Amino acid sequence: DIETGNPNTIGEFPQQENLEERKVVFNPHQEKGKVDEIKDNFIALSQMPDYKNKPEYIDEDTRDEFCTSNKLRFLRKYQHEAVLKIQEGIEEGTERFLLEMATGTGKTLTSSAIIKMFLRNYGVKRVLFLVDRLELETQAQKEFNEVLKNDYTTVIWKENEKNWNNAQIVVSTVQSFISNNKYKRIFKPSDFDLVISDEAHRSLGRKSRRVFEYFVGFKLGLTATPKDYLKSINVAGLTEKDPRELERRMMLDTYTTFGCKSGEPTFRYSLLDGVKDGYLINPFVYDARTDITTELLSETGYIFEDTDEDGNDIEETFTKKDFEKKFFSEETNRKFCETFLSNARKDPYTGEIGKSLIFCVSQKHATKITQILNEYALELYPNKYQSDFAVQVTSSVMGSQQMTIDFANNTLNGFSTSNEYYRTSKTRICVTVGMMTTGYDCTDLLNIAMMRPIYSPSDFIQMKGRGTRKKDFRMDWIDKTQLNE
């Protein structure tokens, strides 16, 4: 890039049309007017421009309750710093940015502030927010509307294919754009002046990167997976098809794509930062692996030695691929469930097993684990749960998507009857395989059980991240006057 002096890696050779349109339309160094001074109330001003004049806000005794009841969102210090880092980069001529922020630290709220900043100050007319899962489309639109609806319109592209261009923020799965090359057939390179990729290193595969590079303008990547997460792994010993090697290459490619070849993102806020600042909870790990499962998942596998009926020595090696088929016996599954129930954290106000997620190897395995847990619940808590103690939430179960919403809202199969003044879900455990990972927001989860091997670092971080958010359980009291009783 001889004009801006800020070269970037591209996924394919650009067409003449793209280059000409970029020259005419996208000029990050154009003369700018007065730029907003971004403060921590940048989003709150969109939600309620005159909030400072409200008597309930002026009165310090009622201010917190006023902000909470009106759901006013103020940027935390690190979120504010992330926005300012982007602003600094723009002033220096940077066009690509990468935010590395731990799960639960508010990447979407930070993105909302960044989107507002771009739309107000830097000639950006429309923003494309790319996700890689259907449920994240709806969630992103909901979160953007909660804080920006007074200023900007947010739509999901596949629901507004005819009038999407009336909106300032368009949310879509990258798969929708890839299908039949829709991104080329329907859109011009200049239709989006800012493209944001959520969980960038996972969503920007080879094909999806073409979508990302097709549009001219600013580019922002979001990720919760730090690049150095695999630094302790012997890279030389990994095969090309090893999930860790594939993920390592994706991470490196992602940092390069966003101009971070040094390995340093535009802004970083880790899990440890969040714990230190009091925003996140560091998980307590209970390791329930046996010697056999540890060997089974090792590079060499588990070597089984015995003798047959004729007295001949038998030696057989079992590896990762045998984990489910040959080692998930009834006895093993029961041991898993017993260990979980013995160590699971309890709800602070009902004493029940805290709300939990269990990740299984397959849908068949999830069915079995659910069945065993409900059998134990019947023994331990007769007539309390009616087989609703644990529920299978997988793609094969009708209404599973709604189940995830009900569980987060504490309404799955009704309410717990343990405390009439306190609201929590009757169902205590959701048993799943791949659902309820990325982007699933359920702050009162107390236990995450991984009853399967997990080879992808980003999957592990996302699963673990479901349980790192802080929760004030007092907020779930229907009648808070009963709290001290």
Language-model segment annotations:
Residues Q168, E316-T432:
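Conserved C-terminal RecA-like helicase domain
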Residues R185-G221, T225-D228:
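SF2 helicase catalytic motif II
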Residues L134, V155-N163, T173-S179, G205, ...:
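Conserved helicase motor
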Residues D1-R126, E135, Q139-N150, N165-I169, ...:
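ATP-dependent helicase/translocase motor core
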Residues L99, V124-R133, G354-S362:
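Conserved RecA-like ASCE P-loop NTPase motor core of nucleic-acid helicases/translocases
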Residues L194, V391-E485:
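Conserved RecA-like P-loop NTPase helicase motor core
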Residues L134-K158, I372-Y381:
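Conserved helix-turn-beta segment of the N-terminal RecA-like "Helicase ATP-binding" lobe
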Residues V235-G354:
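Interdomain helical connector at the RecA1-RecA2 junction of SF1/SF2 helicase-like NTPases
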